[in-house]
Amino acid sequence: LIKSVINSKSQAQGNLIIERLAMTGCVGVRLDQMAILLEKLRKAAIGEPRWVAEKQAFEYQDRSAKVVAVLKLVRAAHGVSAIDLLCRAGLFVDFGALIRCINDSVSEIYFLLEEFPRTSGNVDQFIAEFFARTIDGHLSDDTPQVPTKKIRSAFVRVLSGSHDDQARKLLERIFRTFSGYIHASYSHIMEVYNGDTCDFNLRGVPSIVQRDMRMQHVDVAAISVLHAGAFIAQTLGLTEQHGEIMKLEDTSPTLS
């Protein structure tokens, strides 16, 4: 389904994909293989950053939508590796917070490359805000942020082929759900309380059943990141990388 949406962007299939990414972990993805392919894509798309001695940091000199999109993919893929470990350890609050970060990064990729190589005013503003947060300047950054609703709307348009209010509202609900983990909401904190032992499982929820249930979210996150990578490769005309990434979906039986 995701493969056909990336190629055709039909509205009906786009809606199914958004629901599938939200609710099911239907395809296993080997995270080590995914990491290799996404790093290969990164190297082909934007190359290596340059060492800036005076800042003691690596930086990309090309400040474009392409570079930001690929770096957002890097962040999302790193997050998938992290939630895999957190889920296995039963650390569900931080697990949920990172899922929100992954979802945001994936949405931003589609927003950035929706009209590539053209960029809208909102995309230009997003790029300026992104690069304003450099190693030496992040504390003084005053660049306004692009509203998140505009970013998620672009995500829906790319997958559905048009504006779809129902799909947008679904993404809004997902956003609000996982925002609770970041903002330490009451209900999300109470999820980890064990009434039998009268403690909050500060070293992780021990229940294997609970861990297995949440591992479905790792599947969903891995799939969404993998196909964001395929979208980048297709948009940039990297045919080899696009084919390799899409093939991984069909050849990987398990997640880890």
Regions inferred by a protein language model and the residue ranges of each:
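A cross-kingdom marker of C-terminal helix-rich interaction/assembly modules
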Residues: 1-105, 109-256
